[in-house]
Structures are given as C-alpha cells and as structure tokens.
Amino acid sequence: MDPNSNSSSETLRQEKQGFLDKALQRVKGIALRRNNSNKDHTTDDTTGSIRTPTSLQRQNSDRQSNMTSVFTDDISTIDDNSILFSEPPQKQSMMMSICVGVFVAVGGFLFGYDTGLINSITSMNYVKSHVAPNHDSFTAQQMSILVSFLSLGTFFGALTAPFISDSYGRKPTIIFSTIFIFSIGNSLQVGAGGITLLIVGRVISGIGIGAISAVVPLYQAEATHKSLRGAIISTYQWAITWGLLVSSAVSQGTHARNDASSYRIPIGLQYVWSSFLAIGMFFLPESPRYYVLKDKLDEAAKSLSFLRGVPVHDSGLLEELVEIKATYDYEASFGSSNFIDCFISSKSRPKQTLRMFTGIALQAFQQFSGINFIFYYGVNFFNKTGVSNSYLVSFITYAVNVVFNVPGLFFVEFFGRRKVLVVGGVIMTIANFIVAIVGCSLKTVAAAKVMIAFICLFIAAFSATWGGVVWVISAELYPLGVRSKCTAICAAANWLVNFICALITPYIVDTGSHTSSLGAKIFFIWGSLNAMGVIVVYLTVYETKGLTLEEIDELYIKSSTGVVSPKFNKDIRERALKFQYDPLQRLEDGKNTFVAKRNNFDDETPRNDFRNTISGEIDHSPNQKEVHSIPERVDIPTSTEILESPNKSSGMTVPVSPSLQDVPIPQTTEPAEIRTKYVDLGNGLGLNTYNRGPPSLSSDSSEDYTEDEIGGPSSQGDQSNRSTMNDINDYMARLIHSTSTASNTTDKFSGNQSTLRYHTASSHSDTTEEDSNLMDLGNGLALNAYNRGPPSILMNSSDEEANGGETSDNLNTAQDLAGMKERMAQFAQSYIDKRGGLEPETQSNILSTSLSVMADTNEHNNEILHSSEENATNQPVNENNDLK
C-alpha cells in the first residue's frame, strides 16, 4: 500500500477526532437524560467512592424507570456519555426507509413517461397531419428539436436544483419542481395545436424533470440505510422503465384516434403522476443530512428516528448522527463551497477531481450506450426494418426494460458497483456489434427478428446494470458539503449528452438530404462507446458497496486506484462491522473456549444479536468436544431481569446488576483517534466494546488497522503494542487452561461449605454453571457476562459476591491475578512511553484506570482484593505462569 495514503488516512482521522468530540457534545442535547432523583444514586467518580450492591441496584432500577425522551439544548443536564451509548442499539426497521425511497422514485416515472411519450406521439397519424408544419410528417430537423429540447430544459433544471435544495431542503425542491414547474410545461403541451407551443412546453417540463432527477437520487442516498442504498437508488431507474412502459401502453391505446385526444390524453395523464408525487412528499420527512447541513440536530434526530424505526435516543441512531455531524463540520471547517470546488481536490475532499470525472463519465457513457436511440426513435427504426407492428415491438422493448431492472436492484449490493458495470458493459458491447453486423449484412425479416432479439438483450443488460448503478454512484460518491452540487452536475451531464444524442441522431440515421443515412450501422458507434465505458469503469470506479456516505472519503484516501479499491473496501467494512461469523466458533489455538460471535456484516441479522450468548448443550468430555444443539441465541439478561431473578443455582442472595456505563477515558495531550465505549468488567479490566475492541488501556485501541498499516496508534495496529497485548491475552489463556485447583471455603452468606474450582468450558466440572453467558471479546478472551462476571478465568467467577469474594480473590489465585496485572501495567507504561512522555497526573490517570478495581465492586470485595494484592506483592510471581 502507498505509505503516503496511509499517512494521509491517519492524519484525516486525527483531524476529524476534534469534530467527533464536538458533535458528541451537540448530540447530548437531544439524548435521554436522567431525572434529578436518579442523580442522587450515581457514583461520585471524583471522590473514588464505591457503590454497594444495594445502591447499584437502586441506581439501575431508577435508570430503567426514570429516563424519559426529551429534546433540550441544555447539555449541562446530561452528566456523561453513558446516557448516550450505554444501552445496546435497538433493531432498526428498514421498512420505512424502503417505503420512502421507493415512493420518491415516482420522480423517475415522470422522466420515463415523458421520454417514451414523444417516441409514440411523433408517429401518430393525427399528429403528423395536424401538428406537423407540412401536415404530412416531421422533418429530421423538426424531430431533432422536438425530441432534444426536453433534455435542454432538464440540463438547466439540474444545474439550478442544488441552490434550491441546499437553501430550502430536498423535500420542498421536489414538491416545487413537480406541482409548479412540471405542471406548467405539461399544460402548454396539452393545449398545443402546433409544434412551437409543444416545444416550449417540453422545455419548461424539462426544467422540472431536471431538478427532480438531481434531487430524488440525492434524497434517496441521504435517507436510506447503507445496506439498502444501492438498491433503493436503483428504483429510480426502475421507475423510469415503468414510465416508458406505461407511456407506450397508453399511446398504443390512443394512437388510432383521429382527433386531438390521441395525443392530449397521454400528455394530460402526467398531471396524475406529478400530483401523486407532490402530495405524497408532504407526508415524508426531510433528509436528515440536510438538517445537519443547517445545524438542526434535533430535527435530524427526529428524521433519522422516523426512517430507522427506533426511538430518537437509540444509541445506534445517535452514533450515526454524531458521525454525520462530525464529518460535515470537518468539511465545513475549510470554508464554503461553490461549483468550482466540485472539481478541485483538497484535504476535506480527497480525490475530488477523480470523483467528479467518474460521475460525469458514467452519466455520459450511459447516454452514449444507445439506449435512448431505441426509446426516442425505436418506432421509426423498427418501421424501416420491415416489422409489421412497430408499436408492439416498441412495447416489448419497454417491457424487457422493466423486467430486467428488478435483478439489478439486487446485483448492485450483492456483486458491487464495479463488477456490475464491467459485466453489463461487456454484454452491451457484444449485443450492439451483433445488431450492427446483422443489420448491415442481411435485409430479411429473419434478420430483423435477430436484430430485435439482440436489441432486447442489450436493453436487458443495460437495465440490470448501467441503468440503475450509474445513478447510485452519482448520488453517493461525494462529500456532504458539495454533494448536492456534484449530484446536480452529474445529472446535468446526463441531460447534456442526452440532448446531444437526441439532436444529432436523426441526421445520422435518417435517409435524405443533409443526413448520413447510417441506419443499423449506428450500432457500431454505440458498441464502440460501450467498450470505452468498460475501460473507464475498470480504471476509475471505486467499489463503494457497504460503506456509509462518510466512509467513502476514507476509501479514496486509502486506495490509490479503482482497481485495488475492493480490497480497501473490505478492510473498512471489516473494521467497522466485521465480516460474517458463525454463531459459534471453536478456536483451536488453545487460547479460548466455545464462544458466541455477532454477525455484524449481515444488516438483516436481528439486533438482539448485539451480545450473543451460548444456548444449547456443550459436551466437554475428553474425547468429544462439540456443540450438540443451538436452538437459539438470546440476549444477555437486562438489569431488570437479573434484579428480579437472582442466580438461584449458586445460592446468590445479593444480586448484582450489570454495569453498562462508559468509563471516562483519561485525557491525553493528543486527541483520541476514534470513539470508544468502555464497559466495567471488574478485576481492573475495562472492555472497549466499540468495534469489538480488546480489553483496552489506550483510548484508541478499538481502531482496527490492516496488516499493511502497522505503525498506527492502536493496540491492534502497532507491532510492539500488539505484541504486548498478545502477551496479556496469552497469559489469560494460560490461566483459563491451567490445571483445575480447588479450595474448600465457607460461604460467608449461607454458612455452607463449597468447593471452588479452577475450570473452563474445556475442563468442565461436576458443578455445572448453568447461568454463565460467554461472549467472545476477541484475542483469546471470553467474558462471562452473567451478573457482571469478569473475564472467565473461573467458570463461576460471577458468583464472587455470593461467595464473599472467595472465588476470584482467594489466595490461590492471588499470584495469577498479580501476574496478569503486572503485564497490564507494563502495557500501560509502554503506552505512556509511546505518547512521548505525559504529565505526571495524566500518567497516574492511565495507570490507575488499568490497575484499580472498577467502581462496581462492594467494599467487602475491595478489601479482600487489596489484601490479595498485598500478599501477591510479597511473593514472587511463579515463573511457570509468566509466558515469555
């Protein structure tokens, strides 16, 4: 990988961190807050006081019952970040995003209907005899102007769209363009009795359609979840195909009429489609990213809540909002943007020149593919091939266009943008060349049927690939600060090339004076242009499948060319989401037990997989270790569930609810590289749960770097830090797999004699721990999450409260715990050294965070633990347990 790209990526992350912190503070103002009564039960972390199980129980109960959803700008009422991200995100519903995205695609239907309409109207006998100036037929020049001037209007409409959409919103722009601009143009066309008024009406309608074509894909991209973005934007092209088909069907039913209704009925029906879209938009939300653009975070949160189907205080929704806000603020810090900035690369817009070229080139090659030649002039062309019913053939081509757009909705997310465009372009090239060869060689009815068959193949390939994917890429490729302008430029490029093709095609194909009379030879031109488009796609298009709109910037920084972009796309997705894992995976390296892993890659996986647990019977006999049955995966018990259902199997009388609050991150002289989310595991360990990070001492340890990026600031990327962290994990694995030991102790609560064993799932004892819920923390660690169990050095470590602290803190394990903490202290010191020396107070904060007992243990346990550590300090650590 290019080291410069790695350096730029790292610099970008560092610079964005400050904006992430500021965005987090802003989002606090719209998050859940605790009532004053709840504050009375929280721990004063500054005094170091320890909460008892009773106070902890009361605090969690109050938190569950007293937090309410409010909007407020007074961020002082929210004490810490734990309110924002302490609870697992709820399962998001994709239904509303799908409905919104599909509905606004009606804008594409207007485009397709008007495009197909002119193809049929100019061939109607009544129109040729009453509207055409010579009352016989339209000349090549008249056809050229009549067809192309719609595209001229759309060109200007697309360029004006960003000014309206950035000033007043995406939603008002769509409403204004349909109910006013488009309807005015449509009225002129309905009332036209001659070619002049018909042309003027098409230009005005074109302005409305152009604005819609620039804003609808933009709205879809900004409102839709990333897992559906490609498919939803592709519905815009699908709606275009339906418009073409319906216009052909309507014209087929009216073309035989011998009065003005033959063309006025098809044109007048456009009032229905435009009114349907305009009225429906009143009930849809504004784009959340537009609200961020206008710094209206409360409205942005409400919009996201509507689109994602979760409450406004959901942690997953708030994290998404923080990311959107921080990315936009980072871009805005470089100043306002204009149309010129869309073509200039900068720190806030990496490879912007290439991105702009990619969007414009794709739109141009889409129009140069030859598709609009068939839809604009198909009826006339089929007439000249000897086909008896050209209207029927034209209708068939429209039907093929509709049908094959459906698989394209799935191809774009399943195969990715690059593969779909390359494969589709190759098929289109071959089909065009075959049509040209057959059309030039033979003049028979059989040859005409072969031509029609391969034209249908070309349309099928176009519809499933280039038709929708080009709009997807044009809508998602650009930073938020210039996104509306760039999308408008791409749409304008589409219409400009469309205008050129519509203007010159009659002169190229038709026979007569001042024409080239190419006929079927024009398909050689389309085939050659398709081949050029494939080359451009291969070299310039970056694979953006599965990335958020904000992650696309990182892709362009990391990847030097589009050819290698799929690798970096995979790296980014794996870092953020993790690829698909089996629900249960057995690690054979001797460092872990059977553990559950979340399927983070599949967005359709229910969100209750956020913390998976093992469910089913596991046979741990010496000769056979396998999972017998996994009926289902369930959530870790909630605070309320555990409070109501104490651990009866262990005789637990004082329940301890799980603490899912964030541990404050020590402030360093450098900003954290990425957001972190800490959970108190007890015994001096804090787990960074963000992106499945390992137990973390550094605030940026959740950052996953690829193997090519060794040298980054995280514990997973830095070679020396990674080695040290591996030592810690190896040590814990050694503890997990050490020989079972037992000590007979007396339960201080019940007075019963109990045997405490050193065992794991791989050395199961007779005392089955039915209530242990193991989670895979990665890197050889398994967490027993039931009742806040620490990393499962002991299978029954969650019973420490009920057993008077004798489980994990007895003298038999003191040396082991001391050795583990010694290694963590070494790692903390290496982290301090790496920072280049910090203030003494900062060093103390880091070391205390890594070594101190977390706040959720009781005073009794605290005393025993300190006593154990003192004993361990006076005894040398067993060399056999210290992994080299």
From Swiss-Prot:
UniProt entry keywords in alphabetical sequence: Cell membrane, Glycoprotein, Membrane, Sugar transport, Transmembrane, Transmembrane helix, Transport
Record note on modification: Phosphorylated in the C-terminal tail on Yck consensus sites in a yeast casein kinases YCK1 and YCK2 (Yck)-dependent manner. This phosphorylation is required for interaction with HXT corepressors MTH1 and STD1 and ultimately HXT expression.
Transmembrane regions listed in the UniProt entry: 98-118, 144-164, 179-199, 203-223, 230-250, 265-285, 359-379, 392-412, 420-440, 452-472, 489-509, 522-542
Gene Ontology terms, MF aspect: carbohydrate:proton symporter activity; D-glucose binding
Signal peptide span: none
Domain of life, per lineage: Eukaryota
Protein name listed in UniProt: Low glucose sensor SNF3
